[in-house]
């Protein structure tokens, strides 16, 4: 099962439940779907949940758990980063807790790829610089395939493109 939800750089808005939209989509939505799938997967031999995250999680320097619905401190980039860090943390914790299942939970991120996710990005100089480092989608999907098919899994590893050596815990 691949758990992947992503919106990025969207203007501030809230869901009808009062959740900020980026966190609602990227974290709460994918977490809810993953938990709903667990019941179906628990009896499947050698099943695997691959959580798709983002290199953006590595840019969080200070954890924030409160005020995430506050428009006055909203930053599209930062909230995207938080949503991916929370998703990764959830996945690591879920993998520890479902020891009675035959299901593993792993995390992979594609690096910075040329995909439609950037269609709303800011055309500023910093984004033009980032654009120079984007890889093609086939390079980005390699860590997802590795996380999906590896015979031996490393616990709490983030599978990432080898070209940028982004491994380990965020």
Regions found by a protein language model. Give the residues of each.
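Hydrophobic residues in the alpha-helical elements that line and stabilize the ATP-binding pocket
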Residues: 1, 33, 90
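N-terminal Rossmann-like NAD(P) cofactor-binding module of classical short-chain dehydrogenase/reductase
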Residues: 2, 23, 50
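Conserved NAD(P)H cofactor-binding loop of Rossmann-fold oxidoreductase domains
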Residues: 4-10
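NAD(P)H-dependent oxidoreductase Rossmann-fold/reductase module
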Residues: 6, 49, 54-64, 68-170
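Short alpha-helical oligomerization interface
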Residues: 10-25, 72-75
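Conserved catalytic-core motifs of eukaryotic protein kinase domains, centered on the activation segment
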Residues: 11-15, 44, 61-63, 118-119
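Glycine-rich NAD(P)-binding loop of the Rossmann-fold in SDR/ketoreductase-type enzymes
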Residues: 21-29, 82-83, 135
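Amphipathic alpha-helical dimer-interface segment in Rossmann-like NAD(P)H-dependent oxidoreductases
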Residues: 25-46, 57-62, 95-96
């Amino acid at each position: 099962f691949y758990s992947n939800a992503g919106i990025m750089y969207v203007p501030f808005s809230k869901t009808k439940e009062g959740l900020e939209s980026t966190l609602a989509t990227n974290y709460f939505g994918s977490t809810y779907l993953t938990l709903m799938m667990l019941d179906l997967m628990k009896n499947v031999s050698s099943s695997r949940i691959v959580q798709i995250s983002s290199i953006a999680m590595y840019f969080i320097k200070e954890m924030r758990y409160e005020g995430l619905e506050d428009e006055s401190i909203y930053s599209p980039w930062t909230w995207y980063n938080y949503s991916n860090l929370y998703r990764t943390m959830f996945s690591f914790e879920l993998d520890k807790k479902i020891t009675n299942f035959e299901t593993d939970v792993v995390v992979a991120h594609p690096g910075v790829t040329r995909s439609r996710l950037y269609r709303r990005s800011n055309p500023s100089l910093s984004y033009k610089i980032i654009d120079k480092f984007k890889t093609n989608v086939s390079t980005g999907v390699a860590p997802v395939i590795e996380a999906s098919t590896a015979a031996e899994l490393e616990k709490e590893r983030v599978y990432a493109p080898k070209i940028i050596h982004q491994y380990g815990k965020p």
